[in-house]
Amino acid sequence: MANLKTKYQQEVAPALQKQFNYKNVMMIPRLEKIVINVGLGEAVQNAKALDAAVADIAAIAGQRPVITRAKKSISSFKIRTGMPIGCKVTLRGERMWDFLEKLIYVALPRVRDFRGVSPKSFDGRGNYALGLKEQLLFPEIDYDKVDKIRGMDVIIVTTAKTDEEAKALLKGLGMPFAER
């Protein structure tokens, strides 16, 4: 299923090298990793919510997520240091390419009233962040087994130095950016 990787190697990388006049092939921006994060405020009261989120993310990513814990105690949120408050998974290599392909060609087209992802979500260092409102966008999630709709953050980390280079990379891979 790594068609996206071959597309990158055969089409996107040479096009980027030409567009930005890179002298060395190692200067061409490439994907480093994709981080999927789910923050769960309700995990404080409901421990089963965390297990369900972990199972969902494991199904989507094909890799077991790590549970994230609170760094500080915050009394207004009723959390203490070390309490589980979410989960995240870092994808690299083949799994990263598989997930990106699934995100671009399956999950994003399923979003209601989808007009493209925001071109403003770059962080200034060539990384792209994107929020999804529900886990049902992915085909691995069975609608009948979902206890609660949860969103997730997807962070695409690239080796690009600027946002312009990162946008050209993602656009070349088929990321549907919204036109202003």
UniProtKB/Swiss-Prot annotation:
SUPFAM superfamilies: RL5-like. One of its GO terms (cellular component) is ribonucleoprotein complex. It comes from the Bacteria. Keywords: Ribonucleoprotein, Ribosomal protein, RNA-binding, rRNA-binding, tRNA-binding. InterPro entries: Ribosomal_uL5, Ribosomal_uL5_bac-type, Ribosomal_uL5_C, Ribosomal_uL5_CS, Ribosomal_uL5_dom_sf, Ribosomal_uL5_N. Signal peptide: none annotated. GO terms for molecular function: rRNA binding; structural constituent of ribosome; tRNA binding. GO terms for biological process: translation. PANTHER family: 60S RIBOSOMAL PROTEIN L11-RELATED. This is one of the proteins that bind and probably mediate the attachment of the 5S RNA into the large ribosomal subunit, where it forms part of the central protuberance. In the 70S ribosome it contacts protein S13 of the 30S subunit (bridge B1b), connecting the 2 subunits; this bridge is implicated in subunit movement. Contacts the P site tRNA; the 5S rRNA and some of its associated proteins might help stabilize positioning of ribosome-bound tRNAs. Belongs to the universal ribosomal protein uL5 family. Part of the 50S ribosomal subunit; part of the 5S rRNA/L5/L18/L25 subcomplex. Contacts the 5S rRNA and the P site tRNA. Forms a bridge to the 30S subunit in the 70S ribosome. This is Large ribosomal subunit protein uL5. It comes from Symbiobacterium thermophilum (strain DSM 24528 / JCM 14929 / IAM 14863 / T).
